[in-house]
Amino acid sequence: MDYTLTRIDPNGENDRYPLQSQEIVSDPLDAHVHRSVYMGKLEHALHDVVNWGRKNSLWPYNFGLSCCYVEMVTSFTAVHDVARFGSEVLRASPRQADFMVVAGTCFTKMAPVIQRLYDQMLEPKWVISMGACANSGGMYDIYSVVQGVDKFIPVDVYIPGCPPRPEAYMQALMLLQESIGKERRPLSWVVGDQGVYRANMQSERERKHGERIAVKNLRTPDEI
């Protein structure tokens, strides 16, 4: 079977994976509120209820690429108990999964397979890039490793580390839940490209910058 690797052009328009849909300048429901306070508030409440159900029942697709996958499945143990976030139901089929975790090194031969699995997932769907190798190729700056999975599929949350700890994976789940809670997706039964509106997500460095600068008393190295 022949595979073709579709590379995303950040500066161009791609009907298959539109990067411009990842950003939004304003919430489209604000206009509804101004036109009709009652219907606008009702639509806000309806979106909140739907998003609450989506973010608290995230089913991951069960596949791994390398060592980061071991850290991912460690979060399913009783010590961490990822079931608190509604993400303990591993799916063996991409058609039944809500989000994909690209955990580990993505080789060039594996990239078209990942892309096909992503295409088989049903909307709404999200992607978490776990580990330095999945984020940017890591220490493998060679011809056989893709330098970041966002070269061919859209990524919602990045997890740094080599490999990241299970706590980092759980934090990524909480960030994804926060992002899903602010999404505005069509509530129609019609299946198709109707536009998805997402709030701009700040990086953890920007979000925690003020808190880190305000710290005056640093902990000793044996406490970190």
Swiss-Prot record:
Its cofactor is [4Fe-4S] cluster. It is found in: Cell inner membrane. GO terms for molecular function: 4 iron, 4 sulfur cluster binding; iron ion binding; NADH dehydrogenase (ubiquinone) activity; NADH:ubiquinone reductase (non-electrogenic) activity; quinone binding. GO terms for biological process: aerobic respiration; electron transport coupled proton transport. SUPFAM superfamilies: HydA/Nqo6-like. It catalyses: a quinone + NADH + 5 H(+)(in) = a quinol + NAD(+) + 4 H(+)(out). [4Fe-4S] cluster binds at C67, C68, C133, C162. One of its GO terms (cellular component) is respiratory chain complex I. Keywords: 4Fe-4S, Cell inner membrane, Cell membrane, Iron, Iron-sulfur, Membrane, Metal-binding, NAD, Quinone, Translocase, Transport, Ubiquinone. It is a peripheral membrane protein. InterPro entries: NADH_UbQ_OxRdtase-like_20kDa, NADH_UQ_OxRdtase_20Kd_su. Its EC number is 7.1.1.-. PROSITE patterns: COMPLEX1_20K (PS01150). The keyword Lyase does not apply. Pfam families: Oxidored_q6. NDH-1 is composed of 13 different subunits. Subunits NuoB, CD, E, F, and G constitute the peripheral sector of the complex. NCBIfam families: nuoB_fam, PRK06411.1. NDH-1 shuttles electrons from NADH, via FMN and iron-sulfur (Fe-S) centers, to quinones in the respiratory chain. The immediate electron acceptor for the enzyme in this species is believed to be ubiquinone. Couples the redox reaction to proton translocation (for every two electrons transferred, four hydrogen ions are translocated across the cytoplasmic membrane), and thus conserves the redox energy in a proton gradient. Belongs to the complex I 20 kDa subunit family. This is NADH-quinone oxidoreductase subunit B. It comes from Proteus mirabilis (strain HI4320). The lineage of its organism: Bacteria, Pseudomonadati, Pseudomonadota, Gammaproteobacteria, Enterobacterales. The gene is nuoB.
